[in-house]
């Protein structure tokens, strides 16, 4: 990735108001900015979870959705998703579908770093064999939505806060099959 990866800053209405270096926006007083989350689904309806690298600035070592990122200024979401799928997981994303267009959250990690994002949520498929970038992904697993729901209920602290907030909304929107084996 570029050493000067930029993110889009937003006002409270979600309107772009500027840009800033990604490295400088995740602080104790993070400004609202644009991001995305993507959930990869395999042919039997399982969701790819990834465990964040211990090198990550926010929520290191926790399990989360397949991958996340920030579209750069002027970059389309689909292009950002393709870029991050390749960078984080070494695969090409396809069949990209916007499922939660208005998701927004603010969360504070144990070190005090704030996430403050307008973060549309997508589901997609992949082609190729996973080849995770160890600077981004410490581990990964395909899991049924039913098992994920159970894990979130019993061990919520093992997961990123955005996964905990997004997952019930994904189920409500019928974006994920609750039973593995169901065609996604």
UniProtKB/Swiss-Prot annotation:
It catalyses: isopentenyl diphosphate = dimethylallyl diphosphate. The lineage of its organism: Bacteria, Bacillati, Actinomycetota, Actinomycetes, Micrococcales. GO terms for molecular function: isopentenyl-diphosphate delta-isomerase activity; metal ion binding. Keywords: Cytoplasm, Isomerase, Isoprene biosynthesis, Magnesium, Manganese, Metal-binding. Pathway: Isoprenoid biosynthesis; dimethylallyl diphosphate biosynthesis; dimethylallyl diphosphate from isopentenyl diphosphate: step 1/1. The keyword Manganese applies. The active site is at residues 68, 117. It comes from Paenarthrobacter aurescens (strain TC1). GO terms for cellular component: cytoplasm. Residues 31-165 form the Nudix hydrolase domain. This is Isopentenyl-diphosphate Delta-isomerase.
């Amino acid at each position: 990735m570029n050493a000067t990866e930029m993110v889009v800053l937003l006002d409270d209405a979600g309107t772009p108001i500027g840009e800033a270096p990604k490295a400088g926006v995740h602080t104790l007083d993070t400004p609202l900015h644009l991001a995305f989350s993507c959930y990869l689904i395999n042919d039997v309806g399982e969701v790819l979870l990834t465990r964040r690298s211990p090198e990550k600035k926010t929520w290191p070592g926790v399990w989360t959705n397949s991958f996340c990122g920030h579209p750069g200024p002027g970059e389309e979401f689909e292009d950002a998703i393709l870029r991050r799928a390749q960078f984080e997981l070494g695969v090409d994303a396809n069949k990209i579908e916007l499922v939660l267009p208005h998701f927004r959250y603010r969360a504070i990690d144990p070190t005090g770093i704030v996430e403050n994002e307008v973060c549309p949520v997508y589901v997609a498929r992949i082609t190729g064999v996973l080849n995770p970038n160890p600077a981004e992904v410490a581990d990964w697993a395909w899991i049924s939505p039913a098992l994920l729901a159970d894990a979130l209920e019993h061990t919520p602290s093992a997961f990123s806060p955005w996964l905990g907030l997004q997952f019930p909304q994904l189920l409500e929107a019928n974006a994920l099959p609750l039973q593995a084996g169901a065609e996604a």
